[in-house]
């Protein structure tokens, strides 16, 4: 061990002896005068002393002055030779390297000494109040005096040497660090680094903002496109409903339009707030137009689009869907006549014999005369002449010469057929009106006479001298 190290250890042992005396003797005596238990009171005294030295400046100065006097007495150095500033320098120089001792001012040395002493007192007081040391300090003090003080001195010297090593390392690290020339340069360097970090954050936020603006523009375009499509669809829906409204029982068009959002509807009539009376007038007008459209659609969809009949006879060409007023001789009669002709053919009668038989009847001549005067009936006869079934029957009769027309059986069969026809003519058949014509043409009370025609006035029936008119339907 060199001389410098022995000097340092001597100073550390002197420092430890002073504070061990305070903890072991002075604080113990103060604990005896209190009413609480000695152990508890001693712990309070130790904690109070540590806090007082750290927090109370006057108590610290008083403690330091007492230690200065103790140090002078132990070292046998005259106080005039070792003043207080030299005392502080001597204690601090034992903890720091020599090359830094002269560069440190007295004020910094005093602050270093204060930190060292406060840290040392705190650790020593904690060690003394442990369960290992506290019983030896309170009980059997005389027997345990040397043992307790020896352990306290060893702990004190170990802690001070450890603290000296820490301060040495700090000064060496500080020597390797190049300090800035002035505080202004240090502040500038710190702010420059912070400014660079802020600029980097600004760039990131700017790029993110541009990306969000681009997304917003895309969404706005999509929104405008869908709004335009929505308005177009609403307008088409309005037009479609206006065309397809067909009856009074349908949902009123104005009520449906009022449920649509007005800001997306281009019809100005419904965007404006109109009075209730005006809305009723508009709705009534729309319903009237709907009825007119309905009637036109039904007329256009009717079979062959029949006009209202203007002649004295019923329409000669009925539709397949609606029945018409029938005369005493209808299509059913015509079918029956065809069946009778087939029956005559089977019985050996030809159509020629039937015609000769009918020439003896003046009533049938009148019927033919009436048919010749009626142009519409001529069309019906023309249709009958074109019937292929009758032509086939005539051809069949001509091919059968074996049938004798002068047989008495033939004449009896003709009489039976005539009686059947008269019985069928006397039967009253119901006259059915066409419901389709009733919707568009409602004449006054018209009646049908025995000829199967309806009478419009009294003069109409007087024009006919007699005879029945037979209507044949193909």
Curated annotation (Swiss-Prot):
It comes from the Viruses. Induction: Expressed in the late phase of the viral replicative cycle. The chain crosses the membrane at residues 7-28. Glycans are attached at residues 73, 83, 195, 209, 449, 459. Residues 294-305 have a biased composition (Polar residues). GO terms for cellular component: host cell membrane; membrane. Residues 294-324 are annotated as: Disordered. It is found in: Host membrane. Residues 183-233 form a coiled coil. It is a single-pass membrane protein. Keywords: Coiled coil, Glycoprotein, Host membrane, Late protein, Membrane, Transmembrane, Transmembrane helix. Its main location: host cell. The keyword Coiled coil applies. Belongs to the asfivirus B475L family. This is Uncharacterized protein B475L.
């Amino acid at each position: 061990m060199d001389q410098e190290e022995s000097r340092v250890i001597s100073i550390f042992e002197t420092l430890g002896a002073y504070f061990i005396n305070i903890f072991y003797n002075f604080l113990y005596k103060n604990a005896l005068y209190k009413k609480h238990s000695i152990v508890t009171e001693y712990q309070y005294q130790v904690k109070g002393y540590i806090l007082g030295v750290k927090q109370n400046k006057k108590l610290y100065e008083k403690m330091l002055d007492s230690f200065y006097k103790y140090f002078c007495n132990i070292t046998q150095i005259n106080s005039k030779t070792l003043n207080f500033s030299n005392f502080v320098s001597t204690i601090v120089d034992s903890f720091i390297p020599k090359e830094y001792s002269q560069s440190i001012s007295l004020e910094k040395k005093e602050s270093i000494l204060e930190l060292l002493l406060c840290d040392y007192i705190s650790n020593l007081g904690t060690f003394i109040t442990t369960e290992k040391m506290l019983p030896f300090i309170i009980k059997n003090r005389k027997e345990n005096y040397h043992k307790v003080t020896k352990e306290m001195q060893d702990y004190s010297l170990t802690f001070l040497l450890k603290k000296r090593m820490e301060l040495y390392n700090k000064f060496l690290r500080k020597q390797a660090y190049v300090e800035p020339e002035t505080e202004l340069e240090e502040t500038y360097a710190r702010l420059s680094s912070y400014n660079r970090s802020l600029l980097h954050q600004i760039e990131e936020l700017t790029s993110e903002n541009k990306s969000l603006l681009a997304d917003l523009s895309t969404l706005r375009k999509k929104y405008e496109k869908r709004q335009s499509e929505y308005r177009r669809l609403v307008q088409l829906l309005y037009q479609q409903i206006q065309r397809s409204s067909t009856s009074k029982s349908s949902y009123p068009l104005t009520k449906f339009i009022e449920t649509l959002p007005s800001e997306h509807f281009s019809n100005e009539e419904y965007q404006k707030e109109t009075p209730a009376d005006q809305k009723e007038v508009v709705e009534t007008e729309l319903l009237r137009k709907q009825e007119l459209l309905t009637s036109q659609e039904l007329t256009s969809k009717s079979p062959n689009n029949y006009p209202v009949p203007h002649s004295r006879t019923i329409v000669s060409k009925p539709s397949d869907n609606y029945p018409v007023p029938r005369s005493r001789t209808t299509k059913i009669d015509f079918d029956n006549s065809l069946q009778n002709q087939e029956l005559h053919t089977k019985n050996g009668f030809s159509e020629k014999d039937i015609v000769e038989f009918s020439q003896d009847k003046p009533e049938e001549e009148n019927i033919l005369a009436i048919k010749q005067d009626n142009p519409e009936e001529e069309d019906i006869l023309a249709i009958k002449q074109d019937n292929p079934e009758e032509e086939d029957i005539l051809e069949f009769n001509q091919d059968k010469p074996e049938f004798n027309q002068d047989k008495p059986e033939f004449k009896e069969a003709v009489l039976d057929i005539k009686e059947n026809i008269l019985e069928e003519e006397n039967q009253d058949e119901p006259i059915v009106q066409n419901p389709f014509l009733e919707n568009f043409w409602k004449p006054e009370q018209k009646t049908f006479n025995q000829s199967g025609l309806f009478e419009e006035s009294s003069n109409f029936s007087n024009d006919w001298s007699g005879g029945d008119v037979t209507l044949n339907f193909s």
